[in-house]
Regions:
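Short helix/loop segment immediately N-terminal to the Walker
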Residues: 15-18, 93-97, 117-131
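N-terminal catalytic cores of secreted or lumenal carbohydrate-active enzymes
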Residues: 2-71, 82, 90, 95
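Active-site-proximal loop/short-helix segments
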Residues: 49-56, 114-126, 137
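Aromatic (Trp/Tyr) and acidic
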Residues: 8, 52-89, 129-164, 192-242, ...
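Conserved helix-loop functional segments at active or binding sites
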Residues: 10, 85-92, 113-120, 148, ...
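Acidic, Ser/Thr-rich low-complexity linear motifs
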Residues: 121-133, 176-191, 196, 360
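Long, well-ordered core segments of solenoidal/helical folds
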Residues: 26-43, 101-120, 160-184, 231-253, ...
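Solenoidal tandem-repeat scaffolds enriched in leucines and small polar residues
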Residues: 77-96, 103-109
Length: 405
């Protein structure tokens, strides 16, 4: 959230000073929170479970003691990138800027040492959004974070790390067309084994692949691998363009391509599908076959495959929409930029239900199931979902809607 606020601030600071100032103020609270939960030795408070609205007073009955503290290389790579971006953005506090630069380099160093020692993290907290992190997403995150630090410091070691990490990601991208009429390609697999394709449920980090590629192209234009990075962007952009015909006349970007037997990658399958039913593999097959068959092994799904309470499509299509916008800006491709815009249009009412999904914005926005905070202007739901094993939108009436997020 802090990173998004800072991105919005940079976008608006020249055109809407008042709104930009509020965005920066909120972002600075976020930066303070990030720094307070960093212990300076690789460990940090990573998350907590909370289902009540607390009184804000220490040592009372509603205190929560379930804070999860971990030393994960992935977390430190990710936060190093965020801290770096904050250091490049918050220019009204030189002392904070210098501190952010210092901790960003420290956190990246902690992450690098742990990654060299232990390899990919073993994610154990299933309620954290990192639990489903694939190896390709992991390496894209390393590359993006390293490029951020290179942009800030100019140190060649970060440029080298960024270029090296992305090679793994490129090896995970599908470049050979499927055997469908559209010759679909450009999507990413979870790892080099290519047993399963990158998917998300309930939350998404899809945009990190394109963030990493574009930042490499921006910061290392003379690198021998520049054309590989640029071509990766074009492949992925064409992949997104090819998806859009499956949701016409609406502009919601589909979930993407699925292999018929992704459940055989048991580690990836069960890190994605939390609390799956005993017949999850059979349900997987049922759900993908209700999508669009592309060839003997692949199907196109408009909505993700999902089995449990962890569903809702808002984060998924908005993240992919951000990927489209990133590609569109780099490639100067208006069709991709429009795909990004369509995800916003869907969110504010250009959907089959004619409802804005943002409380207080647009028309016909629904009541949310916000059981602890009450209704708040600007709140968004987890999103439109499907009914049973179908692959069409389902949006139940107020009182049974997904929890506001």
């Amino acid at each position: 959230m802090t990173f998004s606020l800072l991105e919005a601030y940079n976008r608006l600071k020249e055109t809407n000073a008042a709104l930009a100032a509020r965005l920066l103020e909120e972002a600075e609270w976020g930066v303070e929170f990030i720094l307070k939960n960093r212990y300076g030795d690789g460990y940090r408070a990573s998350s907590m479970g909370l289902l009540i609205w607390q009184d804000g007073v220490l040592n009372t009955l509603d205190d929560i003691h379930s804070v999860r503290v971990q030393n994960l290389a992935f977390d430190n790579f990710l936060y190093a990138g965020y801290e770096t971006y904050a250091a490049m953005t918050i220019d009204r506090d030189p002392m904070l800027q210098e501190h952010l630069r210092k901790v960003a380099e420290e956190d990246f160093s902690f992450a690098t040492e742990k990654f060299k020692k232990d390899g990919f993290d073993q994610f154990k907290q299933m309620y954290e959004h990192s639990y489903n992190t694939s190896h390709s997403q992991y390496m894209a995150t390393i590359s993006w974070s390293a490029s951020m630090l290179y942009k800030l410091t100019g140190k060649s070691c970060y440029a080298e790390t960024a270029a090296e990490a992305i090679r793994y990601v490129l090896d995970c991208q599908r470049t050979e067309p499927l055997k469908d009429k559209g010759r679909t390609c450009g999507f990413f697999y979870r790892d080099k084994s290519r047993k399963s394709i990158v998917h998300y449920i309930h939350q998404s980090r899809e945009q990190v692949y394109m963030q990493a590629m574009t930042l490499l192209c921006e910061t290392q234009k003379e690198h021998p691998d520049y054309q590989k990075w640029s071509n990766s962007l074009k492949l992925y952009g064409n992949y997104l363009k090819g998806l859009m015909k499956y949701t016409q006349p609406y502009g919601m970007v589909p979930s993407g391509v699925y292999h018929a037997e992704e459940y055989k990658d048991s580690a990836g399958f069960y890190s994605l599908h939390l609390f799956p039913p005993a017949n999850a593999q059979e349900l997987y097959t049922e759900q993908i076959t209700r999508g669009v068959k592309l060839d003997k092994e692949h199907y196109l799904k408009r909505f993700p495959v999902w089995f449990s309470i962890f569903n809702g499509n808002t984060a998924i299509h908005l993240s992919t929409g951000k990927s489209a916008a990133i590609c569109g800006n780099f490639l100067k491709d208006e069709e991709l930029l429009n795909i990004g815009r369509e995800q916003l249009y869907w969110t504010v009412g250009k959907n089959p239900f004619g409802q804005s999904l943002i409380y207080g914005e647009g028309y016909n926005y629904p009541q949310m199931n916000t059981f602890s905070s009450g209704e708040m202007t600007g709140e968004m739901p987890v999103g439109i979902r499907t009914l049973g094993n179908d692959d069409i939108p389902y949006w139940p009436q107020p009182g049974t809607k997904l929890c506001g997020a």
